[in-house]
Design a protein with these regions (language model features):
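Bacterial N-terminal signal peptides that target proteins for export
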Residues: 2-14
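A short beta-strand motif characteristic of beta-propeller blades
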Residues: 30-37, 72-81, 118-124, 161-168, ...
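Beta-rich, blade/repeat-based domains predominating
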Residues: 38-54, 81-99, 125-143, 148, ...
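Beta-propeller domains
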Residues: 56-74
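Short loop/turn segments immediately following the C-termini of beta-strands
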Residues: 58-59, 104, 147-148, 190, ...
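Short loop/turn segments that connect beta-strands within beta-propeller blades
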Residues: 67-71, 113-118, 156-160, 199-204, ...
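Structural motif
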Residues: 108, 153, 194-196, 242-248, ...
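Blade-level signature of beta-propeller repeat domains, shared across WD40, Kelch, NHL, RCC1
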Residues: 273, 279-311
Length: 311
């Protein structure tokens, strides 16, 4: 057998290092994830961490995590023992090391340790409320939408109970929410296909509610995630007004109260949620029609997530 020379070993080592680096690079460029287990995942909301981790909220209850470079959804916070009934919203607050969760039936805003998944608190909404999604202000105040009550509630840092932050007929069907700046909160209506601007006062409560003018129609808008000043991603489920799941980039001019809607990806099944990490916008198909709709009883898998580079 021929002995390996030092130069050959150096070349082989360099080749291996290159191969490993290429594999990591490839893993970081995953643009589609297909999840086959669990079959009752039915994701309704997604959030993410700066390192590329994606966290999914499952409607039947439970929180799942997909680590960077992986495609498998692993249980992070179990349904059992955590008071989950129906999970509609999840939001990672890395600054506060908190995962916020909207549970409904009853409506509650829940807080968990973002690293360990340990419960930190649970904050009840009024009877009949539907806690749907969450946004967090720069000062740490968490806002949660009540879709059934046409209201927003807030939980200030250190507070022990939710406080009503906004109530208005324009908020009927309120669902997703995202900050435009520290004094401006944008929300949508999943039932009325609207985008709405809320001006916030020093106490964090709404002082003015404005129906925005849209550059095009929306189709059951759902999850929203801020990605810049007066700029956010939005996921749409689709309806008679605009069919099919769609991911959009929305830019608002707060002076003219107009919203410019740019399609990033469409032609999907109903997409209830989006998130942004590492320059990519992720959107997920919820497949709720396989749970309670026309396809109930059929195999819903795979549950798919798609990534699009943010312009």
């Amino acid at each position: 057998m021929k002995l390996l020379t030092a130069p050959w070993i150096r070349r082989a080592t360099a080749a291996n290092v290159f191969a490993i680096a290429a594999a990591v690079f490839a893993a970081d460029k995953i643009v589609e994830i297909s999840i086959n287990q669990p079959k009752d995942l039915f994701p309704e909301s997604i959030t993410s961490l700066k390192d590329g981790t994606i966290i999914l909220g499952s409607v039947p209850g439970g929180i799942y995590k997909i680590k960077p470079g992986e495609t498998e959804a692993k249980m992070f916070i179990a349904r059992e023992g955590n008071g989950f009934t129906t999970v509609l919203g999840v939001l990672a607050d890395e600054k506060a090391k908190t995962l916020w969760v909207c549970n409904t039936g009853p409506g509650e805003l829940k807080a968990f340790d973002l690293t360990t998944g340990k419960a930190k608190g649970s904050y009840a909404m009024p009877t009949g409320a539907v806690c749907n999604d969450i946004a967090v202000a720069d000062n740490g105040t968490a806002y949660a939408s009540d879709t059934a009550g046409a209201k927003l509630f807030m939980l200030k840092k250190g507070a022990t109970a939710l406080v009503e932050a906004a109530a208005d007929p324009l908020l009927a069907g309120v669902d997703g929410l995202a900050f435009g700046d520290k004094n401006t909160l944008y929300v949508n209506s999943v039932t009325a296909n609207k985008l709405i601007k809320l001006d916030l006062g020093p106490d964090g409560k709404s002082t003015k509610v404005t129906d925005l003018k849209l550059s095009g129609p929306l189709g059951a808008p759902d999850g929203m995630r801020a990605i810049g000043k007066h700029k956010f991603l939005e996921a749409e489920n689709g309806n008679a007004a605009r069919a099919g799941g769609r991911l959009t980039l929305v830019t608002v001019d707060p002076k003219t109260n107009t919203a410019t809607i740019q399609t990033l990806k469409d032609g999907m099944q109903a997409t209830p949620a989006t998130t942004a990490t590492k320059g990519m916008a992720w959107v997920v198909e919820g497949k709720q029609d396989y749970r309670t709709g026309k396809n109930k009883g059929q195999d819903p898998t795979p549950f798919k997530l798609y990534a699009v580079k943010i312009p």
